[in-house]
């Protein structure tokens, strides 16, 4: 999980979702998991 000030999709499998006001990226590649913080 990377915590970054700006999150971007890395590949086309990445999905941008919002959970409790936090922007997250989920992907089938675990290295692409990110959250905005």
Curated annotation (Swiss-Prot):
Supply the PROSITE patterns for this chain.
RIBOSOMAL_L36
* KW Ribonucleoprotein (keyword) present: yes
The leader peptide range reads none
Origin superkingdom: Bacteria
Q: Which family does it belong to?
A: Belongs to the bacterial ribosomal protein bL36 family.
Protein name as it appears in the record: Large ribosomal subunit protein bL36
Instruction: Give the GO molecular function terms.
Output: structural constituent of ribosome
Any one annotated GO CC term: ribonucleoprotein complex
Q: Which UniProt keywords apply?
A: Ribonucleoprotein, Ribosomal protein
Q: Which organism is it from?
A: Dechloromonas aromatica (strain RCB)
Q: Does the keyword Ribosomal protein apply?
A: yes
Q: Which gene codes for it?
A: rpmJ
Q: Record's InterPro entries?
A: Ribosomal_bL36, Ribosomal_bL36_sp
């Amino acid at each position: 999980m990377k915590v970054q000030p700006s999150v971007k999709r890395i590949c086309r499998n990445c999905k941008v979702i919002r959970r409790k006001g936090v922007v997250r990226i989920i992907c089938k590649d675990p290295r692409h998991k990110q959250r905005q913080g």
